[in-house]
């Protein structure tokens, strides 16, 4: 197996309750849901939700027949499964650098509030492109290095890093901000066509959120999004996977979409395990396909 960059692991964390529920982020949640509803395709067959976590946004993808929730945290996926069930959803614990899927098995993918934890952006975007069909939709959100607060602090000499340079900045371990043009270039190199950049969360201020209703702030934000000023703390991008290979495995049944994250070879079901041709096994436990490490 090739060397893996550092991975941010939320295993066992209280991310849901420490960051979202009851933590004053209803405004951000509404804004993100609103953008997804605006730019998602009307329908689709199979969507990959990268960094799905506890399933906060998963119900926004009800227009897809099948949704695969992927996260590195097994415990986050356990909670998501308890809430969502199994009828339309598949749960996969894996790292996004080594996706355990065959090529071209998804006609949609999203990565929201996730890529800021990745130190090798080109590598993970290439991995995502490899499992998507041509002309499929990829929605990527990223933290914006060139936001108005960072630019102001830099101009006043209160910040050590320059928001105008293209290179990512790691302001806390495994927390990166990205220049919009850096992301644009990385998407292009990975095989995506960028169609739109949508700045969001212009009003991410503790004072405003304590003073004004979340719905009102989200409404103002939707107006500001139309300015396309890329100075907000967060930016959504709408992309399609380019290419003319006509390769598609989109109609494969659920179990048949998987491949070895080590070699890419086919996997066979053997009870509660998926097994490759070398005998390496990955376990299915608590209804979750566990590709974090081979089974003992």
Where are the predicted features?
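Acceptor-substrate binding/catalytic loop of class I
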Residues: 161-182
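A C-terminal cap/extension of S-adenosyl-L-methionine-dependent methyltransferases
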Residues: 153, 157-160, 182-185, 189, ...
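N-terminal, positively charged/glycine-rich alpha-helical extensions of SAM-dependent methyltransferases
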Residues: 1-17, 266-296
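Conserved class I S-adenosyl-L-methionine
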Residues: 1-43, 56, 76-79, 139-162, 292-293
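A short glycine-rich, Lys/Arg-flanked "PGG" loop and its adjoining helix->strand segment in the class I
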Residues: 122-137
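A conserved beta-strand element that flanks and buttresses the S-adenosyl-L-methionine
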Residues: 110
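Class I SAM-dependent methyltransferase SAM/SAH-binding core
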Residues: 48, 52-98
């Amino acid at each position: 197996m090739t060397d893996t960059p550092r991975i941010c692991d939320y295993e066992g964390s209280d991310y849901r309750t420490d960051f979202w529920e009851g933590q004053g982020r209803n405004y951000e949640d509404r804004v993100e849901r609103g953008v997804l509803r605006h730019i998602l395709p009307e329908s689709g067959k199979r969507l990959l939700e990268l960094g799905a976590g506890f399933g906060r946004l998963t119900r926004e993808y009800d227009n897809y027949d099948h949704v695969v929730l992927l996260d590195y945290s097994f415990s986050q996926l356990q909670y998501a499964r308890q809430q969502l069930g199994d009828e339309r959803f598949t749960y996969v614990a894996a790292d996004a650098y080594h996706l355990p899927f065959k090529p071209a098995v998804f006609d949609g993918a999203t990565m929201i509030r996730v890529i800021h934890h990745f130190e090798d952006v080109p590598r993970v975007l290439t991995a995502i492109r490899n499992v998507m069909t041509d002309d499929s939709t990829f929605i990527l959100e990223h933290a914006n290095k060139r936001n108005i607060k960072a630019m102001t602090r830099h101009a006043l000499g209160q910040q050590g890093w320059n928001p105008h340079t293209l290179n990512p900045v790691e302001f806390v371990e495994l927390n990166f901000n990205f220049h919009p043009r850096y992301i644009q270039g990385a998407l292009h190199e990975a095989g995506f066509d960028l169609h739109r950049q949508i700045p969001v969360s212009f009003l991410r201020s503790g004072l405003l959120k304590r003073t004004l209703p979340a719905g009102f702030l989200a409404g103002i934000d939707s107006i500001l999004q139309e300015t396309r000023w890329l100075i907000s703390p967060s930016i959504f991008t709408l992309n399609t996977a380019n290419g003319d290979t006509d390769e598609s495995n989109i109609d494969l049944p659920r179990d048949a979409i998987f491949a070895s994250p080590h070699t890419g070879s086919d996997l066979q079901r053997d009870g509660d395990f998926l097994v490759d041709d070398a005998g390496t096994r990955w376990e299915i436990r608590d209804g979750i396909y566990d590709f974090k490490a081979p089974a003992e």
